């Protein structure tokens, strides 16, 4: 779709500068290399081969492998896939679709999906306009069409994505499976129950994923029969020190600063993959849930003892290489593991999360969980009676004594800082990027016209 876009300044009234006059594709390329957003595939070279090249060039540990990658990126010997998205080596060939109509309503630019992803009939009438506008992203005169070799859709609807897929895996509908559902409209937890078994060849989503993982592990015994090292790039994360690592918008690629992983550029991590173990890992809850911290939105807690409780149920265990793990191979096992280890449904874990929040804020907060420390919900509890969430610092509402959920009552009434760099809510954003785009204050801007979008012949 980027091929049919003009410069960003064409669509919005913005101050005149190097940011607002940049093409969207160039901006995305910069965002990826500076660590502002993810993009996969990562490079124009295979990740596994890249690791082996690092070893051949003398890299003896993970840090030296990372430096090898940085040096190749700086010299431009190694290129980002995002900088040449139409090159054969830079786009995937297999597309799994789940929980969304990706080829229709979820696709902004539906006609371009039909043209370039599928190579089928389309109603695209816009002319490609980006040739003389992109600077960092390579322009290919004849863009590939039909990039995908295989599209697999998990679906119980015959929607647009299913109609255009090579394989449709029939998924169970809402009344044929055990599942959990939530909404931002109220604070109750929805348990989905199977009124009837999945019909004909249908399976639940979880069982379909399980079957895919099993087939993948079997194939891996031929193609990846032993562990292999992978190189993974990750963007700078919210709720981490990296969040404040770039006080100004400098680009290491243009020499404005040094390329430092996790600071001036994306993170680089070496990960060991064992593709023969995917099925085993899919069916079992691994030790990181016990030994690490769980949580979200800057709040965390240890749940090691509750992980051990899952191991006490001998009917729901997986034994892998003579080690026992909690089983999550069946739908209800997954649901109960989630409920058991969530601060929203396990009152003791909510208390621990507030305890950790006290250390960060210096405020007294554990009283918010005192009344529910003995609450521990299971799937059968939810089926028997509607249940609400516990209070939890993961969300900003307070729901004591049947109170209706209202966002930010936690911040207003308990003086807990907002989840921003300053801890305050902001009407004005004193941020270099927002200022350059003219978005530092909320200002009305009319929608672009169909003519600007190239929708008129």
Where are these regions (language model features)?
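Charged alpha-helix within mobile-element recombinases
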Residues: 205, 217, 233-236
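C-terminal segments that line or cap access tunnels to active or ligand-binding sites in enzymes
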Residues: 239-247
């Amino acid at each position: 779709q980027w091929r049919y876009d003009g410069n960003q300044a064409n669509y919005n009234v913005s101050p005149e500068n190097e940011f607002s006059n940049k093409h969207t594709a160039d901006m995305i390329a910069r965002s990826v290399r500076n660590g502002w957003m993810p993009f996969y595939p990562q490079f124009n070279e295979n990740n596994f081969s890249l690791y082996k090249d690092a070893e051949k060039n003398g890299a003896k540990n993970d840090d030296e492998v990372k430096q090898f990658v940085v040096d190749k990126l700086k010299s431009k010997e190694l290129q980002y896939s995002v900088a040449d998205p139409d090159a054969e080596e830079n786009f995937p060939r297999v597309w799994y679709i789940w929980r969304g109509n990706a080829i229709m309503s979820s696709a902004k630019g539906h006609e371009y999906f039909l043209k370039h992803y599928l190579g089928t009939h389309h109603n695209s009438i816009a002319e490609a306009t980006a040739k003389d506008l992109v600077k960092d992203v390579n322009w290919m005169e004849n863009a590939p069409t039909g990039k995908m070799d295989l599209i697999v859709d998990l679906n119980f609807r015959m929607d647009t994505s299913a109609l255009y897929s090579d394989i449709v895996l029939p998924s169970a509908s809402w009344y044929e499976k055990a599942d959990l559902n939530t909404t931002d409209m109220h604070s109750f937890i929805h348990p989905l129950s199977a009124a009837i078994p999945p019909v004909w060849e249908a399976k639940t989503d979880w069982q379909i994923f399980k079957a895919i993982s099993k087939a993948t592990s079997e194939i891996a015994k031929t193609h990846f029969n032993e562990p292999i090292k992978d190189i993974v790039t990750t963007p700078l994360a919210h709720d981490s020190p990296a969040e404040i690592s770039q006080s100004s918008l400098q680009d290491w690629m243009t020499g404005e600063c040094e390329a430092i992983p996790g600071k001036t550029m994306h993170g680089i991590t070496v990960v060991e993959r064992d593709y023969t173990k995917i099925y085993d890992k899919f069916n079992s809850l691994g030790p990181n849930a016990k030994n690490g911290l769980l949580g979200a939105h800057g709040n965390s807690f240890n749940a090691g003892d509750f992980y051990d409780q899952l191991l006490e149920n001998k009917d729901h265990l997986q034994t892998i290489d003579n080690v026992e793990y909690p089983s999550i191979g069946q739908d209800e096992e997954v649901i109960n593991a989630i409920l058991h280890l969530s601060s929203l449904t396990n009152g003791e874990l909510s208390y621990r999360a507030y305890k950790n929040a006290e250390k960060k804020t210096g405020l007294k907060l554990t009283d918010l969980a005192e009344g529910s420390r003995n609450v521990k919900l299971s799937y059968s509890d939810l089926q028997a009676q509607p249940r609400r969430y516990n209070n939890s610092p993961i969300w900003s509402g307070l729901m004591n004594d049947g109170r209706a959920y209202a966002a930010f009552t936690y911040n207003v009434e308990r003086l807990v800082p907002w989840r921003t760099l300053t801890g305050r809510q902001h009407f004005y954003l004193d941020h270099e990027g927002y200022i350059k785009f003219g978005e530092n204050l909320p200002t009305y801007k009319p929608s672009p016209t169909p003519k600007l979008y190239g929708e008129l012949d």
